[in-house]
UniProtKB/Swiss-Prot annotation:
InterPro entries membership: Ribosomal_L11_MeTrfase_PrmA, Ribosomal_PrmA_MeTrfase, SAM-dependent_MTases_sf
The protein's name in its UniProt record: Ribosomal protein L11 methyltransferase
Disulfide bonds: none
Reactions the enzyme catalyzes: L-lysyl-[protein] + 3 S-adenosyl-L-methionine = N(6),N(6),N(6)-trimethyl-L-lysyl-[protein] + 3 S-adenosyl-L-homocysteine + 3 H(+)
Residues reported in the UniProt entry to bind S-adenosyl-L-methionine: 144, 165, 187, 229
Residue stretches spanning the membrane: none
Keywords: Cytoplasm, Methyltransferase, S-adenosyl-L-methionine, Transferase
Cytoplasm found in the keyword field: yes
Length: 292
């Protein structure tokens, strides 16, 4: 069955009203997708976590009048529409175009992120199976890649890890597959925790090795390794808390930081950590170090 798809480039503050209106106009589904595989940041309590650049995809039955839909949306927006695209698609094209965007990716020497519908290119490597979706972080964004490459280079055997702002769980699961004994994940969004749980099961991770918590329920036990891929502002605000969650001699890796923000973040952590030189990738950076 063919479908009419409307794609809108939106910001988080536009999401609620547009979603409600599109459903009222007959959309059979409304989906939010990350426009750039950006890291999820900590949203305000009670809000839906979205990326700063988000694509809204609304699917309608094929005989829907696209011009009438756009006219309704234009009225809702005071005569203006966000950047948009209208196309008619087949079921098979819809599925194939989505799946073809995600190919296996290698990080460091050992680690591969493999969409679950692909064969692992190196069956003997450390292969993390992942279904890209709402669950925040597929490995394609530089910040995720920086963290995965760092984890691949660490000696994790027998270590404990905390993934602060775990999203899909990709970093914690990678650490467990690379030899960590236990990982704890925390995220403000319950959907992210469920996605982390699902991804862990897909990779054969015993739930006892990967407990998940909302921030208010997070145990205050320091870990050997802490990773936090969120954004610079929250990282600066959370510096005392994150420092307290790394044991003396333990390691910390931070990302979600633009290159021009590195100085501010380093200043917030250099009192508690011996920091390595900043690592940059495509305008984003990773800051890592050892707890004093």
């Amino acid at each position: 069955m063919p479908w009419l798809q409307i794609r809108l480039a939106i910001t988080p503050d536009q999401a609620g009203a547009l979603e409600d209106r599109l459903l009222e106009l007959g959309a059979v589904s409304v989906t939010f997708m990350d426009a750039e595989d950006q890291p999820i940041f900590e949203p305000d309590l009670g809000t839906t976590p979205l990326w700063s650049h988000t694509h809204l995809l609304a699917l309608f039955e094929a005989d829907t009048d696209a011009d009438a839909l756009l006219a309704h949306l234009r009225l809702l927006r005071g005569g203006e529409l966000p950047e948009h695209q209208v196309e008619r698609i087949k079921d098979q094209d819809w599925e194939r175009s989505w799946m073809d965007n995600f190919q296996p990716m290698r990080f460091g020497r050992r680690l591969w992120i493999v969409p679950s519908w692909h064969q692992a290119p190196e069956p003997g490597a450390v292969n993390l199976l992942l279904d890209p979706g709402l669950a925040f972080g597929t490995g394609t964004h530089p910040t995720t890649a920086l963290c995965l490459e760092w984890l691949d280079g660490q000696e994790l055997a027998g270590r404990s890890l905390l993934d602060f702002g775990c999203g899909s769980g990709i970093l914690a699961i990678a650490a467990l597959l690379l030899g960590a004994e236990r990982a704890v994940g925390t995220d403000i969004d319950p959907q992210a925790l469920q996605a982390s749980r699902d991804n862990a099961l897909r990779n054969g991770i015993d739930p006892a090795r990967f407990p998940l918590h909302l921030p208010a329920d997070l145990p205050r036990q320091p870990a050997d390794v802490v990773v936090a891929n969120i954004l610079a502002g929250p990282l600066v605000q959370l510096a005392p808390q994150l420092a307290s969650l790394v044991r003396p001699g333990g390691r910390l890796a931070l990302s979600g930081i633009l290159a021009e923000q590195a100085g501010e973040v380093r200043a917030a952590y250099e009192g508690a950590f011996v920091l390595a030189p900043t690592t940059e990738k495509d305008g984003w950076v990773r800051i890592d170090g050892v707890r004093r």
